[in-house]
Each structure stands twice: as C-alpha cells, then as structure tokens.
C-alpha cells in the first residue's frame, strides 16, 4: 500500500498550488490527499494564522497537534477514522465550528472545552445514548447541530420524537439537523 501523505508534504503541495506560505495563510485545504493523511503531525503547529483548516476525506484516526493554531475558528475533519474528541482542548478557546461528520465517534468526552463552539456538524457517527448527547448542553454557545445518522437520532426519529427530545436536552439550539428550532413558549419578537 502507498505510504501515507504527511502534513508536511500536503502543505508543500498546497503551497505550490496556491503560491501562499502556509504560515501566513488564513485558510488551508488539505482534504482528500492521495495517498491520504493518517496523522495530524507536528507540522500543523506552523499554521499560526490559520482560521479555517480542512483535513476532511483522509484517514486520520486522532485529533492532535493543534496547539500552534492560535487563530483556528473552523476545523473540518469529516470523512476520516476519528474515534474520539481528545486533542480539541488546544483550540478550545477559539474554535467556533467543528465539522466532523462521517467518523466513528461514540463518546463526546472532551467536548466541554469548546467554549466558543457555535456549529457542530457530526452526522453519521456512532453516538447512541442520551448521556453522551447531554454533554452538548455544556457548550455555552452551541446553536447549530447536525446529528442525523447517529444511532441515537435514528432510533428517536423512527419513534417520531427526536427533535422534541433533543431540544429539551440542549435547549439553546437554534437549528437541529438543518431545521430551525421553534420554541412553543417564545413570544414573537417585534
């Protein structure tokens, strides 16, 4: 099998293609590398100005080496092999959007560090119980959640009570699975 692409190699390809220096860039796209990236290695720490980093559609198993990304606001890790959220604490103070659909995440341990997270797209993962889902209520800014395709959502959607049950547990949500959340008791604001 072909050797995995390293972050360093992916960054130098990106630099060739865009003509920008990775250390200066605000947005860096390293998605769908051939062969895929398997590790978030220490080369990421050079991306001090990066606000949006895309590493989707690779074979990454662990979130790591984000400590140098002091300005990171959007992290895209969809379609990888990520099993947990460890490693996010390094960007807990800045990250506003986490796109992590199509992975193998079962537990949401570690999500509570995301003090500014507004948007969480984590469809098609493996979360199956309310105890895990409840950890999302600890996120003070979360307002847009996509959770479709997790066993928990599939079970309750089949029973017809997903939106009610989910919004009861995470009452701050404004949007769930792409649909605006309408609260019955809210008065029309004029």
UniProtKB/Swiss-Prot annotation:
Any Gene Ontology CC annotation: microtubule
Annotated family: Belongs to the dynein light chain LC1-type family.
LRR repeat ranges per the UniProt record: 49-70, 71-92, 94-115, 116-137
GO MF annotations, alphabetized: alpha-tubulin binding; dynein heavy chain binding
Expression by tissue: Expressed in the respiratory epithelium of the upper airways and the ependymal cells lining the brain ventricles.
Modification sites for N-acetylalanine: 2
Phosphoserine PTM positions: 56
Organism expressing this protein natively: Mus musculus (Mouse)
Keywords noted in UniProt: Acetylation, Cell projection, Cytoplasm, Cytoskeleton, Dynein, Leucine-rich repeat, Microtubule, Motor protein, Phosphoprotein, Repeat
Additional comment: Outer (ODAs) and inner (IDAs) dynein arms contain the molecular motors that generate the force to move cilia by ATP-dependent reactions. There are two mechanosensory systems that monitor and respond to the mechanical state (curvature) of the axoneme. One system involves the central pair microtubule complex and radial spokes and the second system involves the outer dynein arms.
Summary of the function given for this chain in its UniProt record: Part of the multisubunit axonemal ATPase complexes that generate the force for cilia motility and govern beat frequency. Component of the outer arm dynein (ODA). May be involved in a mechanosensory feedback mechanism controlling ODA activity based on external conformational cues by tethering the outer arm dynein heavy chain (DNAH5) to the microtubule within the axoneme. Important for ciliary function in the airways and for the function of the cilia that produce the nodal flow essential for the determination of the left-right asymmetry.
The encoding gene: Dnal1
Official protein name in the record: Dynein axonemal light chain 1
Quaternary structure annotation from Swiss-Prot or TrEMBL: Interacts with ZMYND10 (via C-terminus). Interacts with DNAH5, a outer arm dynein heavy chain. Interacts with tubulin located within the A-tubule of the outer doublets in a ATP-independent manner.
Cellular localisation: Cytoplasm, Cytoskeleton, Cilium axoneme
InterPro entries (UniProt xref): Leu-rich_rpt, Leu-rich_rpt_4, LRR_dom_sf
LRRCT domain segment(s): 150-190
Alphabetical GO biological process terms: outer dynein arm assembly
């Amino acid at each position: 099998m072909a050797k995995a692409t390293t972050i360093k190699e992916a960054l130098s390809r990106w630099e060739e293609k865009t003509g920008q220096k990775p250390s200066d860039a605000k947005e860096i796209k390293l998605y769908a590398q051939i062969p895929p990236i398997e590790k978030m290695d220490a080369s990421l720490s050079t991306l001090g100005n990066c606000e949006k980093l895309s590493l989707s559609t690779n074979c990454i198993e662990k979130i790591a080496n984000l400590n140098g990304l002091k300005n990171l606001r959007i992290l895209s890790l969809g379609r990888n092999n990520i099993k947990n959220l460890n490693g996010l604490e390094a960007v807990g103070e800045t990250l506003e959007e986490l796109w992590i659909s199509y992975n193998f995440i079962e537990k949401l341990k570690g999500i509570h560090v995301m003090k500014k997270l507004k948007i969480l797209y984590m469809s098609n993962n493996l979360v199956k119980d309310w105890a895990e889902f409840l950890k999302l209520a600890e996120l003070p800014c979360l307002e847009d959640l996509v959770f479709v395709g997790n066993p928990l959502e599939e079970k309750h959607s089949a029973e017809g009570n997903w939106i009610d049950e989910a919004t009861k547990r995470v009452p701050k949500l404004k949007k769930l699975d792409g649909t605006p959340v309408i609260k019955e008791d809210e008065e029309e604001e004029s």
